[in-house]
């Protein structure tokens, strides 16, 4: 019985030690993933979203008209696809 308790304690202590070591090494390398992601997802001015004269899918349509292929139902105030039975 004592041997089983000791082995469980050592297993638990080993897991805690592993967690602490992993956390310490990850906190040292926190800047690397941020730098990597910022370089991958860098936004260029050419790729920014352009302002449209019409509202796209699931956009508010109170002041703007919906783009072609979408409707602005009176029940909801955002552009959605027309219902199949209304086409």
Swiss-Prot record:
Predominant localisation class: secreted
InterPro entries per the record?
Huwentoxin-1, Huwentoxin_CS1
Q: Which SUPFAM superfamilies match?
A: omega toxin-like (SSF57059)
Pfam families tied to this protein: Toxin_12
Q: Where in the cell is it found?
A: Secreted
Name one molecular function that GO assigns to this entry.
Answer: toxin activity
Listed disulfide bonds for this chain?
54-67, 61-72, 66-79
Q: Per the record, what is one GO cellular component?
A: extracellular region
Q: In which tissues is it expressed?
A: Expressed by the venom gland.
Signal peptide stretch = 1-24
Q: What is the similarity comment for this entry?
A: Belongs to the neurotoxin 10 (Hwtx-1) family. 51 (Hntx-8) subfamily. Hntx-8 sub-subfamily.
From the Swiss-Prot or TrEMBL record, give the protein name: U3-theraphotoxin-Hhn1d
Which organism is the protein's source? Cyriopagopus hainanus (Chinese bird spider)
